[in-house]
Amino acid sequence: MCGDCVEKEYPNRGNTCLENGSFLLNFTGCAVCSKRDFMLITNKSLKEEDGEEIVTYDHLCKNCHHVIARHEYTFSIMDEFQEYTMLCLLCGKAEDTISILPDDPRQMTLLF
């Protein structure tokens, strides 16, 4: 992974978790060939372990195949919630939790 190719390493993306794609706004250009072009996504894999889906892939420079970053995305269901995480030098770090129920219990107000 190459910190010289990105504007900011592991930027905080809040709750924006990307299962695929690239965060091109954070890409300053390839440190090896000095070109700023689209990226290739290679070595994509999907694993399921203990009810958790893990998607990993590499971001590569389209021109010289320099490895810019390794992307990891996870999805799991915990109790009544879907949980997502993303960790990538280029795309950033993020996590999100969404209720699988029609009405999110976290948004309910208690009535006394």
Curated annotation (Swiss-Prot):
Q: Which domain of life is it from?
A: Eukaryota
Q: Quick one: which residues bind Zn(2+) 1?
A: 2, 5, 30, 66
Q: Name one GO biological process term.
A: fibroblast growth factor receptor signaling pathway
Q: Which UniProt keywords apply?
A: Activator, Developmental protein, Metal-binding, Transcription, Transcription regulation, Zinc
Sequence positions that bind Zn(2+) 2: 30, 33, 61, 64
Annotated residues for binding of Zn(2+) 3: 59, 71, 88, 91
Kindly give the InterPro entries that the UniProt entry links to this protein.
Churchill_sf (IPR038543), Transcrpt_activator_Churchill (IPR009508)
One Gene Ontology MF term: zinc ion binding
Pfam families, per the entry = Churchill (PF06573)
Write out the similarity annotation.
Belongs to the Churchill family.
- Role this protein plays: Transcriptional activator that mediates FGF signaling during neural development. Plays a role in the regulation of cell movement.
- Family annotation (PANTHER family): PROTEIN CHURCHILL (PTHR31931:SF2)
- What is the official name of this protein in its record? Protein Churchill
Source organism phylogeny: Eukaryota, Metazoa, Chordata, Craniata, Vertebrata
